[in-house]
Amino acid sequence: MDPTLAVGLISGTSLDGMDGALVEIAGSAQQPAVTTLATLALPYPAGLRGRLLHLAEGKPVPVAEVSALHRDVALAFADCALQLIEQAGFRCGQIACIGSHGQTVHHQPPADNAAGHTLQLGDGAWIAERTGVTTVGNFRTRDMAAGGQGAPLVPILDYLLLRDARRDRCIQNLGGIANVTYLRAGGGPEEVIAFDTGPANLLIDGTVQIALGEPFDRGGSLALQGTVDRDCLERWLADPYFRRPPPKSTGREYFGYARARRLAEESAHLPVADRVATVSELTVRSIERAYRDFLPRLPDEVFLCGGGARNGYIRARLGRLLAPARVAVSDEAGIDPDFKEAMAFALLAWLRCTGAPGNLPAVTGAGRAVPLGDVHPAG
């Protein structure tokens, strides 16, 4: 198959803006080669993030505002795609497809025999019309309709691009939520294990915002200065989510700002650096426990991606707790840690346009492999 250009767009649970990746895809659906040609990170336009936070945190929002946000997020994503394509020196007519994840504002996995439901804002029709490029969006719903969690979806990229014949690998994403993909050496897609381990940056960022009014703990510097409070840590680690076996997924509804406020109240007697260290240790220890409880064995290598890959506290602690596994940032494996998820949605859009399935049933719990996403053709 001739090389194809595709764009992937995403905004994560932190709602801090949009990431875009322009990639070249060659090969077959079973063995694609994906090369990143350009990337772009943009903040949301003024006011849009606040409107999204209001909705994502469960506050009352009129239906008209939800509808307007569905349009406005799409227009912001379209502008991100247009800037990315132009800055990379290409024309929209050269792009085969855009994969737009949109902005998750609610994600409820299946529970107690009730079907799940999920909502990502950013209507692909607006993106297709604004760019003139075939756009695929609304990726998660089809997996849920097939009985799955609707998440995680990125492990298909991990499996196709990062599996190794000789070494067990974990790909550990550290976005707002932490999720792991376990790739057994030489294993097939039915052997992939992937799930959300719990919070990553959501609670750390929330703690820093509540205490200092700053957006996040840059480089983990505050956590590195603090001391972990064992009483708070053990109480927080008793959360039932950490004991629940996969497949499982979570989000801002469970580990969002309301939870950060509760943890801040419970740790208010501690110095700020100790609070941040303790919440950061919650991320680290919940990851370690998930590996020991739910993986066949500890991996030989762990590659970190997402914003938390730059957090010195998290990297150092994972390196110690998961030894002798080698812990490194995913760029050592040829994957930009800040844009892996954007790459994944470019790949998922390409798979959808070729008619190939995009989910891994062993990962999401779906009854079968299905094509993911709604297609909005160009023109």
UniProtKB/Swiss-Prot annotation:
One of its GO terms (biological process) is 1,6-anhydro-N-acetyl-beta-muramic acid catabolic process. Keywords: ATP-binding, Carbohydrate metabolism, Kinase, Nucleotide-binding, Transferase. InterPro entries: Anhydro_N_Ac-Mur_kinase, ATPase_NBD. ATP binds at residues 12-19. The keyword Metal-binding does not apply. Pfam families: AnmK. Gene3D superfamilies: 3.30.420.40. It is an enzyme of class 2 (transferase). Belongs to the anhydro-N-acetylmuramic acid kinase family. This is Anhydro-N-acetylmuramic acid kinase. It comes from Gloeobacter violaceus (strain ATCC 29082 / PCC 7421). The lineage of its organism: Bacteria, Bacillati, Cyanobacteriota, Cyanophyceae, Gloeobacterales.
